[in-house]
Amino acid sequence: MAGLVKLSCLVLACMIVAGPIATNAALSCGTVSGNLAACIGYLTQNGPLPRGCCTGVTNLNNMARTTPDRQQACRCLVGAANSFPTLNAARAAGLPKACGVNIPYKISKSTNCNSVR
């Protein structure tokens, strides 16, 4: 029993130490969602394009500098797109351009994020 407790403590300690290292390898979906929260009305209710939305798009683009970060951001965007049944696909695909940002893939529910470089 004591060995099991020690093993559990060791595993927990490794998770605590390695967790932040693994998290820094790519953007989190929380970061992606947080940066794009101001875009929801524009993308789902045909509202106006808020300045805060474009600020978030620009920030996200600036954070996604490596291939793993861009692929992770893409996966988060695809997941978010699939969670909104009222998503305007044309507005989602055109969002980066509307904000003056160039990203290397189209935002859609079916983007193959493994091909993003």
From Swiss-Prot:
Keywords: Disulfide bond, Lipid-binding, Signal, Transport. It holds the Pfam family Tryp_alpha_amyl. GO terms for biological process: lipid transport. SUPFAM superfamilies: Bifunctional inhibitor/lipid-transfer protein/seed storage 2S albumin. Residues 1-25 form the signal peptide. Disulfide bonds join C29-C76, C39-C53, C54-C99, C74-C113. Gene3D superfamilies: Plant lipid-transfer and hydrophobic proteins. One of its GO terms (molecular function) is lipid binding. Belongs to the plant LTP family. Plant non-specific lipid-transfer proteins transfer phospholipids as well as galactolipids across membranes. May play a role in wax or cutin deposition in the cell walls of expanding epidermal cells and certain secretory tissues. This is Non-specific lipid-transfer protein B. It comes from Brassica oleracea var. italica.
